[in-house]
A protein has these predicted regions:
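Single, function-defining residue in the core of a domain
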Residues: 1-169
Length: 169
């Protein structure tokens, strides 16, 4: 999307597929869209906003290392609860490398809290890869929207980057 388009607006146009996982950052806390993902039988993991209002209805007592809590919750804010009436999971995770806590919400009730944290960590690796692409390969935006078009543009930029590095030596 263009930089001026808010992430949650772009989220509404995305074609969600059943059984797929969608990993979002805090900018995507749009409970109407998250409920749509849930209804198409897809899964999401999203960083929770600090002001999330909820009520815990169930807790897991035995927690693996770095998992601070793993609970089933319901939203208590009027509109959030109206837009997402189902329960989902809230995971509090301590990242020892960054020395900070992350809070995730997910409708993937069948995976562990550590798997939730790992899914988000992998999303962050993708963010870092795209940051590297922008800095080193000078890709400002993608010309096409299909997977093949994006791959071709990335491969062409990587080849150009390598050729320039060889010539400079």
């Amino acid at each position: 999307t263009e930089a001026k388009v808010h992430d949650s607006k772009a989220m509404k146009k995305f074609p969600y597929e059943p059984s797929a996982y969608y990993i979002f950052d805090r900018g995507y806390n749009d409970f109407k869209s998250l409920y749509h993902i849930h209804l198409v039988k897809a899964k999401f993991v999203i960083r929770a906003k600090n002001n999330l209002k909820y009520k815990a209805v169930k807790w897991k007592r035995r927690l693996p290392e770095n998992v601070l809590s793993d609970s089933t919750i319901e939203l208590t804010g009027y509109y959030p609860h109206k837009y997402y009436p189902e329960q989902f999971c809230l995971v509090r995770y301590w990242d020892g490398q960054q020395e900070r806590e992350f809070v995730f919400i997910t409708n993937a009730m069948d995976i562990s809290a550590l798997q939730v944290a790992e899914l988000y960590r992998n999303r962050w690796k993708v963010e870092l890869f795209f940051k590297w692409l922008k800095q080193h390969l000078k890709i400002k935006k993608f010309w096409g929207t299909t997977e093949n078009a994006v791959r071709i543009q990335i491969y062409a930029a990587m080849c150009t980057y390598c050729l320039v590095a060889i010539v400079q030596k």
